[in-house]
């Protein structure tokens, strides 16, 4: 068996590889990327690297498949765009020797388009923020406040809050790429549920609460606490069944303060940035995914609550300098906390990853040696 790692220079991929190396030999891992293969070699000290270019995806993946034709190759859905290429490969060539756990292509595309997902939820009576169509907006059939979002994207990029008539300039809204929802009273109190599924059934679950984000308003999670929120699990059960979902799924919710219902905000249909927490709390989504791909028997795990995950470099460090406090307390290493790009790694390997991915190596080299 081999394990194909795409998008090998991402921080979540680095954590994925370190988790895999707890349970598998280095020879089992195939690294791939559409660029910077030399960086991958330096970070992971490996030669088992292949080009997987967007413009030549099918032919590049064929090379990998043929190279290991006598073995099964596990595919991990690291990034959405890469996974779309993988779906198209499967449609054209069939499974070949690849093993994977994915929903239908239609369900995958629906999940990543926030506009289509919102309409789907409303049509299927799944609680979600109220959706306003372009016609609703032009006919003034809506109530303030509103939120304008990109149809496809993750995080807070492109999001705009519209709280009054003066902030709504209809003729400047790109309705092809953006859509409008009601703005709930607590737009930043997002809770996340993490699911491993097979054919519409939840195999394993955990959730987390955000403690700190960067930037503070609408930013990425840099400090979170694990829990087992059964209301979120119950809320996710319906859409997972309706989409007949298989594989990884992260669902973000906001709790409507007027009804106390959890409303679905968005779905991430691939590996998420805090996947490290899954291993740390014994949810073990990575090994579970592989077992499900291979139709192996699985045993239930006791998932731990009240554990933490921190993304120290660079964003928690930036937060510290913007909000100074006792450094010994802020940076204290704790046993109940896992650290993005450090836990399950070693200091030298983590340093190499940070150096080759966060810094421009060529420019730094020129400054050091060319004055």
Task: Give each language-model segment a name.
Residues 91-163:
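A conserved helix-loop-beta module that forms one wall/lid of the active-site cleft
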Residues 291-371:
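Peripheral (often C-terminal) accessory segments that flank ATP-dependent C-N-forming ligase machineries
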Residues 127-129, 145-147, 157-187, 215-219, ...:
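Conserved ATP-binding module of the ATP-grasp superfamily
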Residues 246-257:
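A short glycine-rich, hydrophobically flanked beta-strand micro-motif that places a catalytic Asp/Glu
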Residues 37-45, 88, 138-143, 169-174:
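Short loop/helix-cap segments at secondary-structure boundaries that form the rim of catalytic
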Residues 182-244, 268-293:
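ATP-dependent carboxylate/phosphate-activation module, predominantly the ATP-grasp catalytic core
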Residues 1-101, 369:
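ATP-binding N-terminal substructure of ATP-dependent carboxylate-amine bond-forming enzymes
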Residues 146, 203, 261-266:
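Protein kinase-like catalytic core scaffold
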């Amino acid at each position: 068996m081999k394990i194909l790692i795409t998008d090998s220079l991402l921080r979540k991929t680095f954590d994925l590889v370190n988790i895999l190396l707890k349970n598998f030999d280095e020879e089992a891992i195939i690294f791939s990327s559409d660029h910077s293969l030399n960086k991958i070699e330096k970070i992971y000290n490996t030669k088992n690297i292949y080009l997987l270019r967007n413009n030549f995806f099918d032919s590049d993946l064929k090379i990998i498949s043929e190279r290991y034709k006598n073995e099964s190759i596990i595919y991990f859905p690291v990034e959405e765009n890469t996974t779309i290429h993988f779906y198209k490969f499967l449609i054209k060539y069939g499974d070949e020797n690849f093993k994977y756990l994915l929903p239908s292509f239609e369900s995958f595309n629906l999940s990543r388009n926030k506009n289509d997902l919102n309409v789907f939820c409303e049509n299927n009576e799944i609680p979600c923020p109220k959706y306003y169509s372009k016609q609703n907006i032009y006919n003034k059939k809506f109530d303030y406040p509103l939120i304008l979002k990109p149809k496809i994207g993750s995080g807070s990029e492109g999001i705009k809050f519209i709280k009054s008539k003066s902030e709504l300039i209809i003729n400047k809204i790109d309705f092809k790429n953006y859509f409008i929802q009601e703005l709930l009273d607590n737009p930043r109190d997002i809770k996340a549920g993490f699911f491993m599924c097979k054919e519409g059934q939840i195999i394993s679950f955990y959730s987390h609460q955000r403690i700190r984000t960067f930037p503070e308003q609408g930013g990425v999670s840099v400090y979170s606490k694990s829990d087992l929120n059964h209301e979120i699990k119950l809320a996710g059960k319906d859409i997972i069944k309706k989409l007949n979902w298989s594989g990884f799924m992260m669902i973000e919710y906001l709790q409507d303060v007027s009804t106390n219902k959890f409303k679905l905000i968005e779905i991430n249909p691939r590996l998420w940035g805090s996947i490290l927490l899954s291993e740390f709390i014994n949810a073990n989504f990575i090994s579970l995914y592989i077992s499900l791909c291979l139709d192996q028997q699985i045993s239930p795990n006791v998932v731990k609550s009240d554990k933490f995950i921190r993304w120290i470099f660079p964003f928690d460090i930036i937060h510290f300098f913007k909000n100074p406090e006792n450094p010994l307390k802020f940076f204290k290493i704790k046993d109940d906390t896992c650290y993005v790009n450090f836990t399950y790694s070693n200091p030298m390997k983590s340093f190499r990853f940070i150096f080759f991915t966060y810094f421009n190596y060529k420019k730094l080299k020129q400054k050091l040696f060319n004055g």
